């Protein structure tokens, strides 16, 4: 029930932002959603690029459901199986291709996101997602703990100034 309330509040806010015809026509407003990849399988043979756990797959599908009514122009991930697998259900449901970005070049990537002025989903890592949100908003936001997977950073950019909304989306894992 709590998740449903958060979703409705989120959708109301998103819709109220997109109803401003003047802002939409001028491309002055757009929204970037940043998430960390879902749970990775640390028991996998390839520890440098492990797949998602069953819970991670569920979380990724839940993210797609969460973003079902949200307009997206583009989806970005790093070049790892776990980030691409997290983004895949959303990309598939929206008919979008996944574009790769370099997590070692966050400052340049943040500027690209601002310059492109597109509604986007960015899937990253615990040490990049908060940092990127900070670059987009001018705030000092660092990395977060490795056991945190429920954060969605919603950054609304209006006239090149970002405003951050931190959302928490929990998943009841059936693993």
Region annotations inferred by a language model:
Residues 1-4:
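Positively charged n-region of N-terminal signal peptides that target proteins for export
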Residues 21-22, 28-113, 117, 129-132, ...:
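Active-site-proximal alpha-helix that buttresses catalytic centers in soluble enzyme cores
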Residues 6-11:
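Hydrophobic helical h-region of N-terminal Sec-dependent signal peptides
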Residues 13-16:
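C-terminal motif of bacterial Sec signal peptides marking the signal peptidase cleavage site
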Residues 125:
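Conserved alpha/beta-hydrolase "nucleophile elbow" surrounding the catalytic nucleophile
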């Amino acid at each position: 029930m709590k998740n449903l309330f958060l979703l409705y509040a989120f959708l109301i806010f998103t819709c109220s932002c997109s109803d401003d015809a003047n802002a939409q026509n001028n491309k002055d407003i757009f929204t970037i959603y940043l998430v960390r990849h879902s749970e990775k399988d640390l028991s996998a043979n390839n520890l440098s690029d492990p797949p998602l756990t069953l819970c991670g797959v569920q979380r990724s599908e839940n993210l797609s459901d969460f973003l079902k009514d949200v307009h997206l122009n583009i989806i970005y991930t790093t070049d790892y199986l776990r980030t691409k697998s997290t983004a895949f259900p959303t990309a598939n449901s929206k008919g979008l291709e996944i574009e790769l970005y370099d997590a070692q070049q966050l400052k340049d990537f943040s500027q690209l996101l601002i310059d492109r002025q597109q509604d986007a989903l960015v899937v990253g890592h615990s040490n990049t997602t908060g940092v990127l949100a900070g670059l987009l908003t001018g705030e000092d936001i660092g990395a977060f703990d490795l056991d945190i997977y429920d954060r969605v950073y919603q950054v609304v950019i209006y006239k090149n100034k970002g405003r951050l909304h931190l959302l928490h989306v929990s998943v009841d894992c059936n693993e």
